[in-house]
């Protein structure tokens, strides 16, 4: 009662309070405002954007040190950014990509490095085909209801990879595939969750590709503009440096308290922060047991994003585009992309330090990390020019207390089937957004927009402004960034796995041997 009086006296009464000023929370606030709903966004940091963050200085002009990439089928973020007047440009892959393995550099073109060993090729082909086929069995909006959910959720992705792959070559690349896509280790994540994650991003080729894939484009001026421009539209409806500490929905209206002891009153709350950060908030009444258990069990991925700037794009002299896939345990960086500005200025290579390596290298001084990265690039690209950068930027997301890591939260084994179904379930008048709650491109900016707008429509339904059937809305395809259907050749669809080939050989050998015996003992007619 005392809190209610404080909130009312201060005049802080709103229809909805959104906790979290990232893309998801701000997408929700924008949609609610368009329906005439009074909204307040409370953001803990001194900036908006959440896990997107555009740094601006004289050395880089602008650089995305957080989420940056968009591509075909990510239609919501493309629609929103266009509405906000933000243009995209294509990440450069005009020249050759590079695979670095066992100390050697192998240039290639396409989404995946080529495999010349026929046995390894069968293994690779079967790996991607199996991951995609298993994903087809998993409902994007309810992975816990998949036919084999219990079996796959008890298994780590490492166990599944080891079960599928016969060759070290395929197994090693599969481990890297997990590192790159979810910034965690294969032994840490549930096979069910990872299979779902890849499926809801369009499959193995779509999630990993630059061209026609999740990394095709970036925003001119940086992805931070998405949140910044929504904040400009909302004006004083966004409050920075306001970490929420208490949410009390025990009375008619909900009372929100922030770290600086300000109080706000509202009818509904949208919680748009990573699930694990919800544990920083005191709820009254307490959260339901399943929700409380869930938020304690979803760790964040680990990543340090590194941008190395050079006087010129020296890699292009060798017909390299700047994309490197690096399979080397001692290498700090696992994958890179060209991060040069679309007009060709400020040549740069963006590299990810991922998962176990992020933890290991975070213990080193920044200058030592920089030196190790330059030495790696010099070795992989075969150029001493890599040793002489003009500037270096990095962002260790593991040290961000209001993110906890990046790109996204992951599900360890057993959690999806036991607690996953509550990820989007409202708690009283509290609704949940954030990219982790999305059903398409979860973990990306696209997922953040889907989740924010869905949570906003849930509130609008509660306010009587939209019907229940209008909560989930199909998004039309972007006309500016159309998707090309990903197809597979007859051989990709039908070539046997290594184990299948061995069975065929074994069967053929057995038939041949049987025929020889029958022939020898005159049990077969002679022509």
Swiss-Prot record:
Q: Which UniProt keywords apply?
A: Acetylation, Catecholamine metabolism, FAD, Flavoprotein, Membrane, Mitochondrion, Mitochondrion outer membrane, Neurotransmitter degradation, Oxidoreductase, Phosphoprotein, Transmembrane, Transmembrane helix
The membrane-spanning stretches of this chain are 498-518
For the modification S-8alpha-FAD cysteine, the affected residues are: 406
Q: Where, if anywhere, are coiled coils annotated?
A: none
Question: Could you say which residues are annotated as the site Important for catalytic activity?
Answer: 374
Q: Where is this site: Important for substrate specificity?
A: 335
List the membrane topology term(s).
Single-pass type IV membrane protein
Q: Which domain of life is it from?
A: Eukaryota
UniProt modified residues of type Phosphoserine:
383
- Topological domain (Mitochondrial intermembrane) residues are 519-527
Task: State the EC number(s).
Answer: 1.4.3.21, 1.4.3.4
Query: Which segments carry the region annotation Interaction with membrane phospholipid headgroups?
Result: 520-522
Annotated Gene3D superfamilies: 3.90.660.10, 6.10.250.130, FAD/NAD(P)-binding domain, Guanine Nucleotide Dissociation Inhibitor, domain 1
Q: Which reaction does it catalyse?
A: a secondary aliphatic amine + O2 + H2O = a primary amine + an aldehyde + H2O2; a primary methyl amine + O2 + H2O = an aldehyde + H2O2 + NH4(+); (R)-adrenaline + O2 + H2O = (R)-3,4-dihydroxymandelaldehyde + methylamine + H2O2; dopamine + O2 + H2O = 3,4-dihydroxyphenylacetaldehyde + H2O2 + NH4(+)
Q: InterPro entries this protein is in?
A: Amino_oxidase (IPR002937), FAD/NAD-bd_sf (IPR036188), Flavin_amine_oxidase (IPR001613), Flavin_MAO (IPR050703)
- Give me the Cytoplasmic side stretches, as residue ranges: 1-497
- What protein is this chain from? Amine oxidase [flavin-containing] A
Q: Which organism is it from?
A: Pongo abelii (Sumatran orangutan)
Per UniProt, what is the name of the gene that codes for the protein in this document?
MAOA
